[in-house]
C-alpha cells in the first residue's frame, strides 16, 4: 500500500454527523446563518485539510429574519485536530478567506468548529 493511500480517518463535525470531505458545511447549526457549499478539497490529511468553495451568509440587516444572503468565493483550511468525546479525530478550527468584505467587516477569519455532534 502506498503511503498516500492510507485512510486518514479524520473528520469535520457537520452539526449532526461526522463527515470526510463534505461538499457542504454548516458553520452555525442553530440557524444555518452561514453555509459553505460547493466545496472542492485539494488535500485532506491527518493535520489539515485545504479546500475552496462558496460561502452563503445572512447579513442580518435589518434583522436576521429580513436579511439577505451574501455570497462569496472562499478558500478554506481546517486545522488543529483533536479527539472528540466519541473517540474520532476531528478538526477543531476553520480558517476562511473571502473574496470580498463580509457583513461583519472581515475578509478572513478563524472560527472554532464543534468537536462532537449535536444530539
What role is predicted for each listed range?
Residues 1-8:
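N-terminal low-complexity, Pro/Thr-rich disordered segments
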Residues 50-119:
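Extracytosolic low-complexity repeat regions of secreted or lipid-anchored proteins
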Residues 8-50:
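Short, surface-exposed binding/anchoring microloops in extracellular/periplasmic proteins
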Amino acid at each position: 500500500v502506498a503511503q498516500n493511500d492510507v485512510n486518514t480517518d479524520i473528520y469535520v463535525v457537520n452539526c449532526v454527523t461526522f463527515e470526510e470531505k463534505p461538499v457542504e458545511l454548516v458553520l452555525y447549526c442553530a440557524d444555518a446563518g452561514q453555509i459553505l457549499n460547493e466545496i472542492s478539497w485539494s488535500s485532506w490529511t491527518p493535520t489539515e485539510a485545504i479546500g475552496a468553495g462558496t460561502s452563503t451568509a445572512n447579513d442580518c440587516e435589518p434583522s436576521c429574519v429580513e436579511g439577505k444572503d451574501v455570497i462569496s468565493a472562499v478558500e478554506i483550511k481546517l486545522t488543529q485536530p483533536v479527539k472528540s468525546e466519541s473517540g474520532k479525530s476531528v478538526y477543531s478550527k476553520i480558517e476562511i478567506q473571502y473574496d470580498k468584505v463580509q457583513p461583519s467587516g472581515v475578509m478572513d477569519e478563524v472560527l472554532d468548529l464543534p468537536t462532537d455532534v449535536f444530539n
